[in-house]
Amino acid sequence: MRTGAVSRKTKETEIEVAVDLDGRGTAHISTGIGFFDHMLEQLARHSLIDMTIKAKGDLHIDDHHTVEDTGIALGQAVRQALGDRAGITRYADVLLPMDETLTRVAVDVSGRPYLVFRTHFLRDKIGTFDTELVREFFQAFTTHLGANIHVETLYGENAHHISESSFKGLARALRVALTLDPRQLGEIPSTKGVL
């Protein structure tokens, strides 16, 4: 079983995350931030990673700490579930359309964290959600998973569509990259012999 569970408690947030990489995309998400819950549900559904995420944060200040700390805990849980990463496909990329928006996402689950985020929003908010927090989530998730992730919106106008295509693009790329390759089961997908 490729599962991981992380509890993270700070003075700002309390986060509990559990994942099953070989799931069916079932999501039980509660962060107190409606739009963010919707994005995380898309991430679970389209990656086929079962996710349970319960977060309580200092939302009376703003959403930043809750979004960032959820990204940290989710990245750590997926990293834990991967173990030594033996047998994974490792690389994947996807072009994800959503109405007028097209986003490209490429991932290398290498153990080396690096985010390239070339996505720009024409609005500062989606409802009450700050659009700058999309990047904050991706940065935290990338760093704590230990992956190289590139997100680039080629074109688009609607902020909701840009955000959702980024999350769905990540999901579809992870769905491939985290899949076990039957031709290299038990093998580390690197000439170094370690990731």
From Swiss-Prot:
Pfam name, any one: IGPD
CDD domains in alphabetical order: IGPD
EC number: 4.2.1.19
SUPFAM superfamilies: Ribosomal protein S5 domain 2-like
Gene3D superfamilies, per database record: Imidazole glycerol phosphate dehydratase, domain 1
GO MF: imidazoleglycerol-phosphate dehydratase activity
The keyword Transmembrane belongs to this UniProt entry's keyword annotation: no
Enzyme class: lyase
Domain of life, per lineage: Bacteria
Keyword set, alphabetical order: Amino-acid biosynthesis, Cytoplasm, Histidine biosynthesis, Lyase
GO cellular component: cytoplasm
PROSITE patterns: IGP_DEHYDRATASE_1 (PS00954), IGP_DEHYDRATASE_2 (PS00955)
Catalytic activity field: D-erythro-1-(imidazol-4-yl)glycerol 3-phosphate = 3-(imidazol-4-yl)-2-oxopropyl phosphate + H2O
UniProt pathway annotation: Amino-acid biosynthesis; L-histidine biosynthesis; L-histidine from 5-phospho-alpha-D-ribose 1-diphosphate: step 6/9
Compartment annotation: Cytoplasm
GO biological process: L-histidine biosynthetic process
Sections of the chain in a coiled coil: none
Similarity remark: Belongs to the imidazoleglycerol-phosphate dehydratase family.
NCBIfam families hit by this protein: PRK00951.1-5, PRK00951.2-1, PRK00951.2-4
Protein name: Imidazoleglycerol-phosphate dehydratase
